[in-house]
Amino acid sequence: MSNRHKVFVSYHHALDESYMRIFALRFGNAFRAIVPGSVQVGDIDPNLPTETIRQKIRDEYLRDISVTIVLIGALTWQRKHIDWEIGSSIRDTKANPRSGLLGILLPSYHAHHVRVERGRYNPRTIPPRLYDNIKAGFASIHNWSEDPATVQGWIHQAYLRKSSALPDNSRASFGKNRSGDEWND
């Protein structure tokens, strides 16, 4: 089997677009395809039931994705669309099997969270659903790397993990964007 996977990249569009561009340029050839995060404000009615929202994202935006990558910048954890994309990508549906999941800490994460030692992270400053899945052994988190072989290895491991570990999708979905320095349960 090839180690080239179709990946979906979830990121904070307003703050981390430049990193998404760098990521796509640097690593695009290592993957079968990169699908950038594309659920925008107004695309999905937030008043729909949670299951309907997740199903729409899974079937309309994340079709045929092998692995979801979350680019984690300074305020990524606050975004409802990122929460929805993570929750939808780890759902196993008739039309689409669940995706593997991993997070990559961007340089902007450590620039903003100066008290967090490089190579580490504060669990309350990454997307809560991603953290739940790191704890469950379904997801992993890594520091930004410029080495395509390293990143491709992370993606392949996430792809393999999706069959050997169960995701945790028990957290209530964000109803709106959050604010503050960190999340609380």
Regions found by a protein language model. Name each.
Residues 1-67, 95-97, 155, 159, ...:
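Conserved N-terminal substructure of TIR/SEFIR domains
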Residues 10, 70-74, 104-105:
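Conserved beta-strand segments of the P-loop GTPase G domain that flank and frequently precede/overlap
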Residues 14-18, 75-78, 109-111:
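Short acidic, S/G/P-rich loop/turn micro-motifs used as interaction or catalytic elements
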Residues 22-25, 83-86, 116-119:
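Short, glycine/charged-enriched secondary-structure capping and boundary segments
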Residues 75-91:
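Conserved TIR/SEFIR loop-to-helix hotspot centered on a Trp-containing motif
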Residues 91-103:
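Short, acidic/small-residue loops that bind anionic groups at enzyme active sites
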Residues 101-117:
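Short beta-alpha junction loops
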Residues 114-151:
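Acidic, Ser/Thr-rich peripheral helices and adjacent loops at domain boundaries
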